């Protein structure tokens, strides 16, 4: 057997089918299409952009918005989003955000360059509608 294997484990099991109360998008900036989708999402649920998430960032944001980790949805756009994905009740990632993110995600969307972030945000909009 060559090489090492890495296994990703989630902090919370995904058994909750309730809509999220908080959506965290790991991104520094948004394109016009992404901004439009994010504005719609923000009108329906607490939604924040987190460019460089720190350890425990999701727990801090959940506490600030009176929610739990199980009530949070995360969209990871790069490898920096992995800690958020592992704690979130709903974990979404974009293709190209890193193998670990794709493995930890409930759903993987197209790359950002192909409209994946806007599609992921629109997906969460449907969850909270």
Question: Across the structure, where does each feature detected by a protein language model lie?
Answer:
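N-terminal regions of proteins, emphasizing targeting and processing segments when present
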Residues: 10-12, 125
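Conserved acidic, metal-coordinating active-site core of Asp-based
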Residues: 2-5, 12-21, 26-87
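Mg2+-dependent phosphoryl-transfer enzymes with acidic/Ser/Thr/Gly-rich catalytic loops
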Residues: 56-129
């Amino acid at each position: 057997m060559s090489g090492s294997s890495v296994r990703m484990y989630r902090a919370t099991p995904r058994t909750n089918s309730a809509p999220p109360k908080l959506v965290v998008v790991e991104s520094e900036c948004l394109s016009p299409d992404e901004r439009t989708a994010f504005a719609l999402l923000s009108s329906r649920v607490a939604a924040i952009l987190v460019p460089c998430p720190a350890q425990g960032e999701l727990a801090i944001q959940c506490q600030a918005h009176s929610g739990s980790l199980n009530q949070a949805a995360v969209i990871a756009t790069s490898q920096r989003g992995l800690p958020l994905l592992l704690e979130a009740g709903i974990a979404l990632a974009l293709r190209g955000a890193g193998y670990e993110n794709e493995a930890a995600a409930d759903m993987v969307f197209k790359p950002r360059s192909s409209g994946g972030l806007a599609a992921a945000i629109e997906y969460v909009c449907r969850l909270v509608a």
